[in-house]
């Protein structure tokens, strides 16, 4: 026998690859030492078994903020969400369509857009109108003789006016319903969409209804829906893009979780029981992002209404990129930043930006189709002046199109003529300078108010309860974004960043407060988020996130106090001890003890390690910990949290290790047995408060891997609530109520529901007080003065 044959053999067995076989006998026991095995850089990846891959996928989905595969919210909850949206839609319909024909006058900038829409409907292009006030008076009488054949110079893309022309085509051009129908219906649809977005973000019908009502009763939203101008249409298309962005986040993360879980894994160290990561350091490719493509379409159409939508393309694109980086980091991808750039960032760019450009160009098809439109001769005029063309050799229509855009750019960046109602972007969030859209003084208004002096007024001031409370809510959202890395807070901030912050570069330009209607939905979502946090009814953003609470409403009482059982001495301590076993989120209270299988008390050891699954030994009937009821990083079979803080990627990543971290690593040219794949070693937790059993202690001393294994994937739903025993034998066991899954909203408390109702009541009261000034009703002059709280509102 050669010297090589006398060495201990290494085989693939139940102790894992690269370990000495246990059948060597006593003579070779001293030589049996564990070694790391082959070079991990040459260690090929191995896929998981189907049941382990399924458990891994659901664990990843939880940490990525997604429900498990095939799991939906309860039918009752979903129905309540739709009912909440329907109620909000009804309120929005009444407030926007009631007496929509009043006032029968061209209001504010309707002189540009209503007549422009009529010209598109009548001629196919925007013609010039002869005379200003005279043309408006004739238009109100149905006399359109002021419309001439020569084209009018317009400074906005045509899509918004084509949409407004649809209302005139349906209801005629001689009444306010025809002029304003399109903007009114868009306003109602925006309310429904905000309610559905809130339901998707917060998973609470109560908060969805609150968001819908707040959106439906905001004064700026009502005024802009009852006026034939472009900004309401712009806001709706951007909101559609935001909705598609949220769907893309879910869709792309679900794909990533599935491909990681069913892909190949390897151990960086090659050691048995070591954490596992995807074999590909770049992670899997996520091909196909249809919802991001849809977001590009919606944002491109928004740009076809007004150019300010271009900032939404940039802001939402950055949000999608940041979420992709965070998702790969959570999934344990080693080169997560590079993969986020090249495998997610570039494909996302080519899904979003070209779609937006194509949709924007599609909005100009009528302009290309009709040579009578303004700007078609710009290329020829430039050649006559001896100027060069933007694209030499391109058709005149293309060069004229580019020159037309240069002309619009120059107009928007040089408009600085003074206006009585102009304001700055920082004035908008406090509603300092609203715009007077319509005013009929006492000398012209009919005397229908019952007072000596009656007036009719329409002002664009928002609901002060929404906007002023929204300013406080914005602070809460910023705290949640930076402190808790809550993706919902970052999504709301993306809306602010898209439609509000860019105006800071236009301080020298004439701009108006009603532009803020474009980010009104995000003000409402911020207020909803803050109210939900204060009322403690906002669910978790992902499986590892604690409940958000800023102490504005008292925390819920412990479940034990809701039960009709006596509270003898020691019950509170033993209950907290038991809950700490389940959640691993709080220290043992003084005097708390654990219960051994035999019933004798055992002193807790806060420094030793013990498998969390052994809680059933100390508390009979306790199920295995559910991976979605606590921080996944604290459970066996799931990755340990990284000590490196997560990057500021607008998400809530908690770790950087893929699941499952403790699978034995099969050596090359071997197959993993079912027991190898299905029984991962549980990682030792040095922070556990329980002492190891004898087998674990012996295994630790000999250097061998732990002898206990997880029985398989953990069930996400406990079979039965455990019984928690008191050290006092005279105290009967207390059954703790079953714990909710992480995605379920917390139980509603009367104080929380009352708080939400109180804020909603304030919003309704403010809307009732201001509604006459949002709709131009005939009111007394003194009643109008009662609403002018600030001198800048006059």
Please describe what each predicted stretch is:
Residues 92, 211-216, 223, 299, ...:
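Short helix- or helix-capping micro-motifs
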Residues 2-16, 283-291, 324-325, 335, ...:
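Transmembrane helical bundles and short interhelical boundary loops of multi-pass, membrane-embedded
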Residues 106-107, 179, 183, 220-233, ...:
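Short acidic/glycine- and proline-prone juxtamembrane loop motifs at membrane-interface regions
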Residues 75, 87-88, 177, 194-217, ...:
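Transmembrane-helix signature of polytopic, membrane-embedded enzymes
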Residues 97-140, 347-348, 356-431, 778-789:
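Aromatic-rich transmembrane-lumenal/periplasmic boundary elements in polytopic membrane proteins
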Residues 193, 233-282, 298-299, 523-529:
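Specific aromatic-rich, kink-prone transmembrane helix
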Residues 1-95, 343, 347-356, 631, ...:
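Start-transfer (signal-anchor) and selected internal transmembrane alpha helices
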Residues 181-202, 240, 476:
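Transmembrane-helix motifs of polytopic, lipid-linked glycan transferases
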